[in-house]
């Protein structure tokens, strides 16, 4: 009988807002502290010649320009390029030597949902055996989950049309 009574009582919970915040405007927006340190692209060295680059949340069927700094690696010379084996969804745009290492600019195409990893191999112009593996990791959201807050160094450069949308030229079978 105690179990029957427990189910009949509605539970009411309240949300409290801090003084000075508008309760109506706060329901649909998440506000982040401006001093957050994790709002930049994170580059982690996994081994002697391997790096993991975390670019945060991206939206499916969008193209992004990603810029990050790769620490100086003794094995690489000033003239590095993308190795012949490359990904369809990650394209190297430029490599610029800077005092901290290299400024890498690439274009990433978010082609499916989930946590995606795309690899890029950077090789020296003169030495075939010298290369650095760069893995770009992104969390790709579907089109119905809003617009992600992009990290510093990530810029949306375009969206690709969906074939099943009303933007399609195909009108179906007659």
From Swiss-Prot:
Positions bearing N-acetylalanine: 2
Localization: Secreted
Gene responsible for this protein: Adissp
GO molecular function, one term: protein phosphatase 1 binding
Keyword Phosphoprotein applies: yes
Disulfide bonds: none
Chain positions found as Phosphothreonine: 147
Pfam family, one: DUF4517
Main function: Adipocyte-secreted protein (adipokine) that acts as a key regulator for white adipose tissue (WAT) thermogenesis and glucose homeostasis at least in part through activation of protein kinase A (PKA).
Family affiliation: Belongs to the ADISSP family.
Entry keyword set: Acetylation, Phosphoprotein, Secreted
Coiled-coil residues: none
Origin superkingdom: Eukaryota
Signal peptide bounds: none
Name the record gives this protein: Adipose-secreted signaling protein
Keyword Acetylation listed: yes
Gene Ontology BP annotations: adaptive thermogenesis; glucose homeostasis; positive regulation of non-canonical NF-kappaB signal transduction; positive regulation of protein kinase A signaling; positive regulation of transforming growth factor beta receptor signaling pathway
GO cellular component: extracellular space
């Amino acid at each position: 009988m105690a179990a029957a009574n427990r189910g009949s009582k509605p539970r009411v919970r309240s949300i409290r807002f801090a003084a000075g915040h508008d309760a109506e405007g706060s329901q649909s927006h998440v506000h982040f502290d401006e001093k957050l340190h994790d709002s930049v692209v994170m580059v982690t060295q996994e081994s002697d010649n391997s790096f993991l680059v975390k670019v945060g949340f991206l939206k499916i069927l969008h193209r992004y320009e990603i810029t990050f700094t790769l620490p100086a690696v003794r094995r690489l010379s000033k003239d590095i390029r993308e190795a012949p084996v490359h990904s369809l969804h990650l394209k190297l745009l430029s490599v610029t030597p800077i005092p901290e290492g290299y400024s890498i600019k690439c274009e990433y195409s978010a082609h499916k949902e989930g946590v995606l990893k795309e690899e890029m191999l950077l090789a020296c112009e003169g030495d075939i055996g010298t290369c650095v593996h760069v893995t770009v990791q992104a969390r790709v959201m579907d089109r119905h989950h809003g617009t992600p807050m992009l990290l510093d160094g990530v810029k949306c450069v375009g969206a690709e049309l969906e074939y099943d949308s009303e933007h399609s030229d195909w009108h179906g079978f007659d």
